[in-house]
Amino acid sequence: GVIPCGESCVFIPCISAAIGCSCKNKVCYRN
C-alpha cells in the first residue's frame, strides 16, 4: 500500500498485481 509500482490503473487493472501490487487512487501500489 505504500510503494508505487510505477503503473497506473485508470483504464486497465494492475499488471504488476502479479508481484503483489494493487490499485489505489488510480495508481498501483505494493504493501
UniProtKB/Swiss-Prot annotation:
This is a cyclic peptide. There is a cross-link at G1-N31 (Cyclopeptide (Gly-Asn)). The lineage of its organism: Eukaryota, Viridiplantae, Streptophyta, Embryophyta, Tracheophyta. GO terms for biological process: defense response; regulation of defense response to virus. The presence of a 'disulfide through disulfide knot' structurally defines this protein as a knottin. InterPro entries: Cyclotide, Cyclotide_bracelet_CS, Cyclotide_sf. Belongs to the cyclotide family. Bracelet subfamily. Disulfide bonds join C5-C21, C9-C23, C14-C28. PROSITE patterns: CYCLOTIDE, CYCLOTIDE_BRACELET. Probably participates in a plant defense mechanism. Has anti-HIV activity. This is Cycloviolin-A. It holds the Pfam family Cyclotide. Keywords: Antiviral protein, Disulfide bond, Knottin, Plant defense. It comes from Leonia cymosa.
